[in-house]
Amino acid sequence: MLETIGVAHLEDLVAHVPEKLRATAAINLASSMDEAEVAAEVTALAARNSGALDFVSFLGGGYYRHYVPAAVRAITARAEFATSYTPYQAEASQGTTQMIFEFQTLITQLTGLEVANASMYDGASAAAEAVLMARRILPKRGVVAISRTLWPDYCATIRTYLSALTDIDLVEVPFDLATGATDLAALERLAGDRLLCTVTGYPNAFGVIEPLGRIVEVTHRAGAISISVTAEALALGLLKPPGALGADIAVGEGQSFGMAVEFGGPGLGFIAARAQNVRQMPGRLVGQTHDPDGRRGFCLTLAAREQHIRRERATSNICTNHSLCALAATAYLALMGRRGLRELAAHNVALAHDALAALEGAGIRPRFSAPFFNEFVVSIDNPGASRAAAERRGVLAGLALAPDYPELRGGLLVSVTEMNHRIHFTRLVEALRGQG
C-alpha cells in the first residue's frame, strides 16, 4: 500500500503533524474481533444506557415521547426511501418528490400558511433560518425580538446564526412571572421602526399557550414580521393555526410525528410562510407539474434560490433535508387523519390536566396561571434533589428550569403524553414526595 501511494514509511503520512501532538507511548489496542465478538461488545456497551422503557418519563422540553405506529416504521424502512442519498437533483424519483410534496401540503394545513419547504434539520435551525428569511424580506431593519419563553437551545442556535451579522441586534422580551406568557407591555416598548421580527413559542418553553394573535398585532403595527415557533407539533392538531392568527412565518420541530426520542435526534424542522415570500424561503421546494403527455408529476421548483445553483447568493446553506424524517411525519399524519390528530392532541391535554390535578392534591402547586397544552411548570423545593430521588424510584420527573431561568428557582417542567397513564401520576407524586 505504501508503495502504491508513493511513501516509504507509515510515519510519512503524519509528517505534517507537530511532534508535540503525536502520541509517543504505545497505543494499547485490543486484538481484532470477529463479527460475533463485535456484536457482543457493542451490545454490552449499549446495555449501559437507560432507555425510555426503563422509566416512567415526564421529560419534555422540546422533544416528546409519542407512540409511533408500526406502519410508520415499516414505510420508512423500505429500500426505496431508506438511503443516504439526498434527493435534491432533478432526477430524484417521483415517489420521493411526491412524498415531499405531500409533506409540504400537510405542513401548510397544520400551520394555516400557503407554502412550506421540504424540511429543515430541526426546529432550532428552522427558527434561525426564519429570522434570516425575515432579514431578506426587510433588509433595512435590524432588531430581532425573541421572547424569553422560547426554548433556550432555540435561542442559542439563533444567536449562533446571527453572530457574524453586525447589523442585527438581538433583544429578549421578558415574560410575565404570573402567567408564564410573553410580557406584551414590554414587547410594545420594543416595537419601534427598526423591529425586524418577533420570535414566539406556540406553545412556549413552559407549555403555556401564548396569546399569539395579540403578539402578531403588536408586531404588525410596527411593520415587522411575526415568527411562530412550535416545538411540540402535536399542539397544531388542536390549536388555532399560526397563519390564521396572522403569523407571517411558522416553524417548528416535527419529531412528535412518528419519530422516537433517540439521544435528542434526529429531528425534523419545518417552515411555512405566505406565498408572497416564497422566493425568500430556505431549503428545497417541490412543486406539482405535468409532463409533455399531460401526466401529473413532481419536480424541484424555484431552485435558483438554493446553494447547489447559486452558492454565494443562495437563501440558505441547508445542504440536505431530512427526507426520511419527513416521510415518517407524512406517513404518521396520513394514518392519523385530521380527526385522529385532533383527538390525540385533546387526549394529551386531558392527561396533562389530570397529572396536574394529582400533583395539586399532594400540595404541589402550578407555577403559572395561563392555559397550557401537554406540559406545565410546578414549584417544588430543590428540584435537583427531587428529580434525583425520583429517578432512583424509576421516574423521570421532569426538567429543572433554574439553570436556564434563574428567576424560576424551584420550577419543574412536567410533560405528559399518551405514553403516560393515570397510574403513572400516582408514581410521580410518590416519587416527588419521597415515598414508594
Place the predicted regions along the sequence by residue.
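Compact, charge-rich alpha-helical regulatory domains located at protein termini
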Residues: 1-24
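PLP-dependent enzyme catalytic core of the Aspartate aminotransferase-like
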Residues: 3, 105, 361, 403-436
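N-terminal entrance/gating region of PLP-dependent enzymes' catalytic architecture
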Residues: 19-102, 108
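Flexible, glycine-rich loop/tail regions that form catalytic "lids" or insertion modules at the edges
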Residues: 26-27, 43, 64-65, 344, ...
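Short loop-beta-helix segment that forms the pyridoxal 5′-phosphate
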Residues: 54, 88-92, 109-128
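Gly-rich Lys/Arg/Thr-decorated short loops/hinges at beta-loop-alpha junctions or inter-strand turns
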Residues: 78-90, 108-113, 139-141, 165-171, ...
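Conserved PLP-enzyme active-site core in the AAT-like
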Residues: 95, 125-295, 363, 367, ...
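Active-site C-terminal subdomain of aminotransferase-like
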Residues: 257-362, 366-369
